[in-house]
From Swiss-Prot:
Keywords: Repeat, Signal, Stress response
Source species: Arabidopsis thaliana
Alphabetical list of SMART domains matching this protein: BURP
Name of the encoding gene: RD22
Keyword Repeat: yes
Biased composition (Gly residues): 94-114
Full protein name: BURP domain protein RD22
An example Gene Ontology molecular-function term: mRNA binding
Length: 392
């Protein structure tokens, strides 16, 4: 009996692993965190277009209406766009990723809105020029489209050192403030959408797929080949910076982990906070990609959500969703209702760090707020795609 019992336990463990492997990321979340709703910011990243060759059409134009249907077959789909003075019909039949699409708008030539779309198996280029917008989309099988962002450090990494130019050029600078500023009626200039280099289009991979993708400096050249990224390019430098941050030493008192899937993020957070009394929250803004604007703290006032340990996960710049997660003690989490000057509303989440003595003295927060490490609590709003976990 003493021999059989460990064998039964071992078989049981294999069964649990096998069952977990068959779960979708969303189902895995609900199994691991039965009492914790998934935030919209994470739910929106559960779109598995990453390895699809299905047609995706985005049309931005004055008065435009877009209707897209994508059937289950690879490369299939129909898109109908009705805009000001124009009708566009796209059919995605043919070879995977192929097809020719013609759009006709009002007037003649490019000024009236003419777009030609050509696609080859695995690749696609869309160019649309019309009244109210110009769109250029290129697609390569296996990764989202890099739209351009200057490679730079994650300002939420504690050992990060900022350059003087970032005080004026980095929109993340506006996210930092002092805890004493969390009062009703306080005005702040903020922009909540974080730039990830891919126009916010990167999504989670299921863990089984994410684990097949090399992630680390030792196999970086292999990673670039996997995503068809040219070594030395701006995109490659951006990816390299993310990996360097994930591999960098942690500061005193910090526990950190880079999650390459939703499932691995859940596992890390559960290991630090437990599974039954945990919440995960993100900033929610009424309008996506809202510009920098002046907000004031609404009359409803600030609400303290947690005053203990928390796990904060920051979305990184990478071809698929990667989150830099770190557990920190002596942090306070707040819900901050904001009203913009143009009527825009936001349900912001703020994290205040009471002990910053181990942070890099040249961190962006200290330069913006003109304070020294370890002197006062330093706070920051979370961009829309970031999430904080805490016990209650």
């Amino acid at each position: 009996m003493a021999i059989r019992l460990p064998l039964i336990c071992l078989l049981g463990s294999f069964m649990v692993v096998a069952i977990a492997a068959d779960l979708t990321p969303e189902r895995y979340w609900s199994t691991a965190l039965p009492n914790t709703p998934i935030p919209n910011s994470l739910h929106n990243l559960l779109t598995f277009d990453f390895t699809d060759e299905k047609s995706t059409n985005v049309q931005v134009g004055k008065g435009g209406v877009n209707v897209n249907t994508h059937k289950g077959k690879t490369g299939s789909g129909t898109a109908v766009n009705v805009g000001k003075g124009g009708v566009r019909v796209d059919t995605g039949k043919g070879k995977p990723g192929g097809g020719t699409h013609v759009s006709v708008g009002s007037g003649k030539g490019h000024g009236g809105g003419v777009a030609v779309h050509t696609g080859k198996p695995g690749k696609r280029t869309d160019v649309g020029v019309g009244k109210g917008g110009v769109t250029v989309h290129t697609r390569h099988k296996g990764r989202p489209i890099y739209v351009g962002v200057k490679p730079g450090a994650n300002p939420f990494v504690y050992n990060y050192a900022a350059k003087e130019t970032q005080l004026h050029d980095d929109p993340n600078a506006a996210l930092f403030f002092l805890e004493k500023d969390l009062v009703r009626g306080k005005e702040m200039n903020v922009r909540f959408n974080a730039e990830d280099g891919y126009g916010g289009k990167t999504a989670f991979l299921p863990r089984g797929e994410a684990e097949t993708v090399p992630f680390g400096s030792e196999k970086f050249s292999e990673t670039l080949k996997r995503f068809s990224v040219e070594a030395g390019s701006e995109e490659a430098e951006m990816m390299k910076k993310t990996i360097e941050e994930c591999e960098a030493r942690k500061v005193s008192g910090e526990e950190k982990y880079c999650a390459t899937s939703l499932e691995s993020m859940v596992d890390f957070s559960v290991s630090k906070l437990g599974k039954y009394h945990v919440r995960a929250v993100s900033t929610e803004v009424a309008k996506k990609n809202a510009p920098m604007q002046k907000y004031k703290i609404a009359a409803a006032g600030v609400k303290k959500l947690s005053d203990d340990k928390s796990v904060v996960c920051h979305k990184q710049k990478y071809p698929f969703a990667v989150f830099y997660c770190h557990k920190a003690m002596m942090t306070t989490v707040y819900a901050v209702p904001l009203e913009g000057e143009n009527g825009m509303r936001a349900k912001a989440v703020a994290v205040c760090h009471k002990n910053t003595s181990a942070w890099n003295p040249n961190h962006l927060a200290f330069k913006v707020l003109k304070v020294k490490p370890g002197t006062v609590p330093v706070c920051h709003f979370l961009p829309e795609t970031h999430v904080v976990w805490f016990s209650y």
